[in-house]
Amino acid sequence: LFGVGLKLLVRRPLTAQIIGIPTWFVATEWLRSSFPFGGFPWGRIAWGQASGPISWLIRLGGPALVTLAVVLIGLLLALSIRKHRAPAYSLAGVVAVIAAYALLIPATPADRTVDVVAVQGNVPRLGLDFNAQRRAVLDNHVRRTEKLESDPDIVIWPENSSDVNPFTDPAARQQIERVQRSIDAPILVGTVSPEHNTMVVWDSEGPGESHVKRFLQPFGEYMPFRDFLRRFSEHVDRAGNFQPGDDNGVVHMNGVPVGVATCYEVSFDGAFRMAVQGGAQILTSPTNNATFGFTDMTYQQLAMSRMRAKEYDRAVVVAATSGVSAIVKPDGSVEQRTAIFTSDALEAELPLSDTMTLSARVGPWVEWILAILGLLSVAFTYRRGKKAFHD
């Protein structure tokens, strides 16, 4: 789809190309990230800039603005080479990025901190069939938590850390209650029911506030067109039947408002945005990465968490069943991280923030405006070309 619009836009004058091509790319990326089945934003260009100099633009306009900058700079460089022009356009792009960086408000020093532990219990073995060993996964997280030598304020377990539902399994409930009493701190526990993928706060009074995963993975956590697709394969029923939640992702642990985006949710703009707008002062992305194996997907997901930390000026705690777990500072740097497929725990004293970055304030408007501008550029070019053909 991008190529169709690009073919039209390259015929336009230089200024029209500079405006139209990057914004059209944003439009097609928005479409892919939104449709079908909620979209697939995992492959957005912005995620590749976690260590790049233009990553700070995410604080102004979210991932869409970073994407725009990447495409714009690449386009200006290409034009300066192809057209044999002086690199004025490239220089203008660099100046624009520097100017945007100067607009950023420095991070406010934290008045309050919280002592957080992320527990990575590990899984018995690789692959999808680890879910058949649910009890062992819970046991691993209980044992690793019992080994903690510190007194944390809050403890984060990963998604699916208790795939044995503690609301229906007395033994699982007793395990969680026992380890919670031993550390005397609330634990964010990942568990499931037939309908929901849930992160629930477990403290001395038992289960409390929870976040039900809102952005679900199609063909895994639920199966679109299940009845129709069953005609072709009985394996469609291996997919879950989860229903999306409707909360804003904020849970309170020891009085701290924590924003939760479970696994796949971290790639969606709305997940952490709703949490920050709902008062979250620290963010966490509990995730089950066991099925990623040794692929790069777990590191791609970590890059997303780093960008979200920059976007909202908040620390992000990544707790994974099998890694990579990480402590990400508000500037996006990784303070600590684990190896994959090991049992480990990370502890850090992290700042609490109530800063509202521009991205948090304006929400999706920057992306919508850029996408509309790109769509109008292509539509105008198409209409103009059609009119010229008839003339």
Locations of regions flagged by a protein language model:
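Membrane-embedded alpha-helical bundles of multi-pass enzymes
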Residues: 1-104, 293-294, 305-308, 320-322, ...
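Residue-level signal for alpha-helix termini/capping positions
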Residues: 10, 82, 146-149, 181, ...
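CN hydrolase (nitrilase-like) catalytic-core segments centered on the catalytic cysteine
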Residues: 22, 154, 161-162, 168-188, ...
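Active-site/binding-pocket entry motifs
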Residues: 51, 124-125, 216-217, 290, ...
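Soluble catalytic regions of membrane-associated enzymes that act on cell-envelope
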Residues: 103-219, 238-241, 250-255, 260, ...
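Short, surface-exposed secondary-structure junctions/capping segments
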Residues: 223-236, 353-364
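Small-residue-centered hinge/linker elements
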Residues: 245-247
